[in-house]
Amino acid sequence: MKLLIISDIHGSSYYAKMIPEIFKLEKADEIIILGDLYYHGPRNPLPKDYSPMDVCNILNSLKEKLKVVRGNCDALVDETISDFNFHDHLLLTINNKRIYFTHGDKYNQDVLPDEKFDIMFYGHFHTGFIRKKNNLIFANPGSLSLPKNNTRHSYIIMDSEKITLKDISGS
């Protein structure tokens, strides 16, 4: 199982259009989005080519391969235009590893959920990283459209062997 993990699109159709291309290029099996799909939020600037409905159409076209975790900028009304479900979190077992997916505003490496896991993926902070802490792996794909702290537009690929943080150029 190969996963494409992205977060924090914030309504940018420019970067959302890259998702199907990255999915195909990486030969991923599924896409997991860690929230903040359509709205840019009051603290963020408008992202490039801001068009929440275009982002929705792109994501709806990928619905068969898509799992989505709700972010702090995602509203209940967003679910009415989306052909996929928004989950509060996901807990999947892949390759005998329990993997917890969340947005990051509630649970992250500093505030752990009650559920036991081996790997936690979360977004929210717009800063990509992969780190180990107390025998657990924490990974953040950064933001596809609005990276912060001098980081790049990025995503994560997870396969049976490793977790890799990549910028949108694929490096």
Predicted regions and their residues:
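Binuclear metal-dependent phosphoesterase catalytic core
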Residues: 2, 91-95, 132-134, 138-171
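Core catalytic region of metal-dependent phosphoesterases/phosphodiesterases
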Residues: 2-94
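Thr-Gly-centered strand-to-loop micro-motif
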Residues: 6, 102, 140-141
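Active-site environment of divalent metal-dependent phosphoester hydrolases
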Residues: 10-17, 39-41, 72-79, 106-111, ...
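A broadly tuned preference for mixed-charge, low-complexity surface segments
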Residues: 51-66, 122-128, 141-158, 167
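Internal catalytic-core helix/loop-beta-alpha segment
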Residues: 82-129
